[in-house]
Amino acid sequence: MTLSKTPPRIERFGDITEVIPLPNLTEVQVNSFKAFLQDDKAPDQREDVGLQSAFREVFPIDESEKGRSTGMVLDFIEYRLGEPEYSPEECREKDLTYEAPLYVKLELIHKDTGVIKGFKPDSPPESWVFLGNLPLMTFDGSFIINGADRVVISQIHRSPGVYFTSSYKGIKKQYTAAIIPMPKRGPWIELEFAGDVLEMKVNKRKFPVSLLLRVLGMDDASIRALFTEFTPEVEPGEDKSAGMGADEALLRLFTVLRPGDPPKRDKAIQYLFGLLADPRRYDLGEPGRFKMNTKLGVQRQERTLLKFEDGKFSDAGLVDTIRYLMALQQGLETVPMVDEDGVVTDVPVAEDDIDHLGNRRVRTVGELLADQLRVGMGRMARGVRERMLLGNPDAATPTKLVNNRPIVAAMREFFGRSQLSQFKDQTNPLSDLRHKRRISALGPGGLTRERAGFDVRDVHRTHYGRICPIETPEGANIGLISSLSSYAKVNDLGFIMAPYRKVEDGKVTNQVEYMTADIEDRYTIAQANSPLNEDNTFADERVLARRKGDPLLYTPDEVDYMDVSPKQIVSINTSLIPFLEHDDANRALMGSNMQSQAVPLVRADSPAVGTGVERRVVTDSGTSVVSDVNGRVSYVDARAIQVTLSEDHRELNMNAGNVRTFELIRFTRSNQGTNLDQHPIVSVGDEVKVGQVIADGPASERGRLALGQNITIAIMPFDGFNFEDAICINEDLVRQDFYTSVHIEKDEIEARDTKLGPEKITRDIPGLSEAALRDLDEDGIVRVGAEVKPGDILVGKTSFKGESEPTPEERLLRSIFGEKAREVKDTSLRVQSGQGGIVVKTVRFRRGDEGVDLKPGVREMVRVYVAQKRQLQVGDKVANRHGNKGVVSKIVRPEDMPYLEDGTPVDIVFNPLGVPSRMNLGQILETHLGEVARLTGQKFETPVFDSVTEATIKEMLEVAAAERLQARKDDGFELDKREQEVLDRAGKLGVIDAPGDDYEKGQMQLARTGKSILYDGRTGEPISGPVVVGIMYVMKLYHMVEDKLHARSTGPYSLITQQPLGGKAQFGGQRFGEMEVWALEAYGAAHVLQEMLTIKSDDIDGRDAAYQSIVKGEEVSGSTIPESFKVLVKELHSLGLDVEVLDHGDKAVDIFEGMMPKR
């Protein structure tokens, strides 16, 4: 349990060499936002994505409004981003948004005269139009909105494209086709059979598809040929549109789709164009057209379903979809498809699996932002058209026409209210990283918890290497929120890719290819643990490999690819669990989730048994300081590190000899109230390289993730104190601050202008002693370093009391003798109950200060940060990485804990019954390897699915035991009789062979089992059987009893029910429900029950009287009528039932007296 000064040696196990390192773990966020902005590219080289595509779709704004021509065109040339006004740190401090101004070059062209207004090549910078501020992403992949860190998580949804699914109508299997555009970019179109007729469904309106085919210019013969292509002998269903021309069919179609509107050709063309042919309103998107081309075996470029040229509609994929559906319905295996070039290919026919990851795509932050921007720009464009129509054309300029408010509002709404923009989880570096790699199926345009069935939540074979099959929440969101696998990437179309090593002629190469799920289905892929020879050929004659998810044995020549790493299946959280392959998935899920709830400790200690991923979490999460230069450390203190460069760094515009300064964060509050603190781990003169951690952040030790502590544990019953997952701990853990964490609370108070006069932040508070004000400065703000307890004043504030209107005489006297001192009341900010600690920082914001934006009516605001040191206590939740969790039930003195033969007391006692039924045996192997770490003083890394073998652990335990036995002999110690008895018992139990007289051999055998002889600390007697003892990595979780413990004597009541409020935040009471009432009834506790239902609940007069009796020390009198009874009576009155309340003398009592005016 000691923390050594010199870092221990780390020994790495694992036979599989990984050909590529883990990619940057936040790249899914950073790359997406970079592609959205494209601010590093010249305007003429920007691709049509993100911001650029949003502008290109809205501009030029020139359409006629309600038949009236605008006579002007507003066109877009380019955009640029200005510099952010404040740094991220300043934004966090001042509650600002980290953002940059967005400017656009626009030109206004008059159609009649050809005059161009707005931007000209020689125009000054002021001619750029300001479109509002755009929030920027910080280097670590998060946003700062109103001073708080937020993360925009990626959304997974059904990819646009064409899908063929089946359902049964009676015993007949019927197929349906669905053509899906990009979200909010057009209607879903369904093609299904109604008897023999193929119908099309658009916007919940059905019509025969032949109607639309006639609009596309097809005649009776070509439609008949289409429907009888695969079944020439079968007569097609009745066609009610037979003999119609294109125009007649168009009008008929318009009356079906818009039954209320008069059918006119121009209007019908305009409507159908907007519905399916206008790229601005109907968009399959690049992913949709790609999926459609892949499915139908054609190569089309249009992103709409219909084309409109020369006043006529033509097909862009609808006929191909119908032919494929007909072939599927007829049970054909292939369908001949003709490309635009006239090339015929046979395309395989099959229905789609909608949960296949080839059919689901991820909308990353850049796409979500672009969509939101489109919404804002659409509103802006409507405003521009109105101003064009109503304003003076000669006076119009781009700046006058464009109003940026809709764009600003759309961005504010997205970051502030969207389900996908979330308050960042900053509990520890791992939770921070995990939040950015989250994928949600919920959110706008996605699923809802209630509608999502089992299939969409379930693990699919295509999740392999793309989405973690283990890490997901346990509640209603199970399967809907998931995590990206460790090596997975998202391609430009939004499909998740997994990496594989190419196999050529049975030889595995180091060439790595990333593949989407539908491409992977074409190949046979071997696992990463397939044994290889030195020349990278497969060692076995038959290789276990999978094709379309089915594992089979193949010859080496049949294998196309091989996994790059065993951990590519699981997420980062899950890959941190050692011996994961020995854990049941349900418990591994809990272990993955609980690591993100671990509180950073004051004494960080990286795991004795890790997996090798710990370093990458620290470098990629952004919570530690990582060097971006090569050089030598020239200066170090608690606030900054300076590195003198040893070579040029062109990307930073720095040359060799320049000094790079890294600022450190000290005692900053995270979103969850944990302590963000960085401290240097380099010294002056040290050489540093790019990517090296030079300052540890929270939960980091020498650049390795350190979420918990390496604790000596025993797995044994302990007098019932560890019953039902309760956990006994050694008091030394508390005394030596092993599980002590720092938590920082933020309190703030505003001084407003009120009707009665301005509130004032001051030290001059009426009715308080000097002792109560001892820690306040002259302005009434608590000093930094003061220790505060519940009820202490943090910021002194006074407000004017309300007073009655003065009489004319008083006004006269006041005007003669001057204003009398008006009475003020104390409205100071005090420490809430259950809180307190040391004041670490105070900040004061006044209206008019630079960068300060206070709410209307607020003159100034003071914010106080109070840090609290929390030690481990009874009721705190602790857990290991394998899902074994529990609550501390008893803190035992070290002398009473079980101890080893050398006198070392164990630190934690876990219940053995918590292991077998939960099947998380990884924790036992971790404990055994941890015992080797304890005995040898080193640390180990054992990668998931490539762990150290049990045989190796046994040998290591035996070697360590032999050294320990020899040391005992050298010191003159022999095995005593009590230890011999334990070994004899172990022999009877079958743990070891019966030792006979050879107790030395018995000891060596016992060491191989990972068990030890343990002594009871209270009696000194050995525990009757051998016990598993070793080091386990145990974390303290965010669920601390101090935040949850709550008691109420009196407090606020609900205005409507007059019952106490609920919850700790409202200082509420505990609900006494019907089952609790039954319990008191069962025991006949009549008086207690009456008290619960009356004076402790909603008996207003009774509780007032009881309170007064308690204050005066008198006996509490009986109760009166509770409010809920009065409600019941009124309910019965409303049903027309006359209910009267009678006293003992059968006289009617008016229980509503004084409540309502008499009639």
From Swiss-Prot:
Belongs to the RNA polymerase beta chain family. PROSITE patterns: RNA_POL_BETA. The lineage of its organism: Bacteria, Thermotogati, Deinococcota, Deinococci, Deinococcales. DNA-dependent RNA polymerase catalyzes the transcription of DNA into RNA using the four ribonucleoside triphosphates as substrates. This is DNA-directed RNA polymerase subunit beta. Signal peptide: none annotated. GO terms for molecular function: DNA binding; DNA-directed RNA polymerase activity; ribonucleoside binding. The keyword Nucleotidyltransferase applies. It comes from the Bacteria. Its EC number is 2.7.7.6. GO terms for cellular component: DNA-directed RNA polymerase complex.
